[in-house]
Amino acid sequence: MQIWVDADSVPLTAKDLIIKTAERTKTMAIFVANQPIKLRKSPLLVMTVVPSGFDKADDYIVEQIQAGDLAITSDIPLANDILDKGGMVLTTRG
């Protein structure tokens, strides 16, 4: 399992919790956004920058996510696409 983060709109408190959880559970967390987001150096944390444009980060996540992966997003259409691929979804509020 990997954690995919729709990082364009993730609040700082949620980002910090995702990072701590990924490191505690030794789970890869991939943050996807159209601009870089500062992450601490860790082999478990990856920042993926996609081109600017409507739903580019969402499209990338849907292309890459595998059944059993977890995504963190507040985007309902993205969540639906992830569920269709067998992924799991949480909002930044749980």
What role is predicted for each listed range?
Residues 1-94:
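Nuclease catalytic cores that cleave nucleic-acid phosphodiester bonds
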